[in-house]
A protein has these predicted regions:
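Internal metal/ion-chelating core segments
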Residues: 159-259
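Glycine-rich anion/phosphate-binding loop at the beta-strand->alpha-helix junction
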Residues: 171, 230-302
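Long, amphipathic alpha-helical stalk/connector segments used for oligomerization, subunit docking
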Residues: 301-312
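Hydrophobic alpha-helical segments, chiefly the membrane-spanning helices
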Residues: 321-327
């Protein structure tokens, strides 16, 4: 099975971020989620044995995307195909008891989002440390400040770094707050009542206890208590808008660098062998700044699109303003 490379992943993302959203790793994450539920269901008295759990654990990393794709062509259902594949590998049929597809996929997506945001928080902190070094290094490097893009008053290059750092720190505070309160969806079933889970476990109390255990296992402090088949898409909007906010400081600073580079005030530098143009190899383009601004443009577009997601009518009841789950 061939996978078309994602341009953003190959040009922008770190290896850690690519691995987090890799299709194989996502399937492994789903399997870990199933196994976690299996163990909790066994504790609750469901007919699941240690041998059943062990059978699944032994094959958790055996992911064959081509085989799953073949199953999906028959079932015409992505989650059912992955269930059948995992059952076939383990030689058992114990996973997904009392669950609907979104009990799996919505929680996994929130886990991925949380982990991705944690990576961005880590890189943002690293960026702040680098900015601090340059603030000190260039605190007495004087230059002409500009207003309306014309010469104004004297400032320093260190001040430019400090302004970027101040905005990034403010944005990072908002990101940190979002990460801390980001919830799991929980095991709410097709319409949000958790009826299948209650029926299999015996009571609402037992289901709530299981949801709390799952949240703890995957590092979440919160689980949504009243939700439909999907978690509120306003959460997605908030996540994307926070990403745009994080990108704002680097993008603003990158724009300043490009403007200053155009008048010869600063330069990103020029590595050995680097060229600025196939026709004019001497050109010293602000390549990194251009890439930063390119990502910011994309994030502005994604934020605009995310505005259309945060109305969440009951799935499959009427036309939705987002891609349908079967797509």
């Amino acid at each position: 099975m061939s996978i078309t490379p994602n341009v953003l992943a190959t040009r922008y993302a770190t290896d850690e971020m690519v691995a987090l959203f890799d299709p194989i790793n996502k399937i492994i994450a789903e399997r870990k989620f199933w196994i976690t539920i299996l163990k909790l269901q066994k504790k609750s008295g469901l007919p699941i044995t240690d041998a059943d759990i062990s059978a699944y654990e032994k094959v958790i990393d055996k992911v064959d995307l081509a085989s799953i794709e073949k199953r999906e062509k028959i079932t015409r259902h992505d989650v059912k195909a992955r269930i059948e594949e995992f059952n076939s590998l383990a030689g058992a049929e114990k996973i997904h008891i009392g669950l609907t597809s979104r009990d799996l996929t919505e929680n996994i997506e929130l886990i991925q989002i949380r982990d991705g945001l944690n990576l961005i928080r880590k890189r943002s902190l690293e960026t702040l440390f680098l900015l601090e070094k340059n603030i000190s290094k260039y605190e007495k490097t004087y230059m002409v400040g500009r207003s309306h893009n014309v010469a104004a008053q004297v400032t320093t290059l260190g001040k430019r770094f400090a302004t970027c750092g101040q905005e990034l720190l403010y944005s990072l505070t908002a990101l940190n707050e979002l990460i801390n309160r980001l919830p799991l969806r929980g095991l709410k079933g097709p319409v949000g009542t958790g009826q299948d889970g209650i029926s299999s476990l015996g009571s609402v109390k037992d289901l709530t206890k299981m949801e709390e255990a799952i949240a703890s296992e995957f590092g979440f402090e919160n689980t949504l208590t009243s939700v439909g088949q999907i978690y509120p898409r306003s959460i997605d909007f908030e996540v994307v808008s926070k990403l745009l906010q994080i990108a704002s400081a680097p993008s603003s600073f990158a724009t300043s660098i490009r403007l200053m580079a155009g008048s010869g005030l600063v330069s990103e530098g020029f590595k050995q062998g680097q060229v600025g143009s196939s026709a004019m190899p001497h050109k010293m383009n602000s390549r990194s700044s251009e890439r930063i601004n390119g990502m910011a443009v994309l994030l502005r577009g994604y934020t605009t699109m995310a505005c259309l997601l945060y109305t969440s009518p009951s799935p499959r009841d009427r036309q939705k303003s987002r891609m349908p789950s079967s797509a």
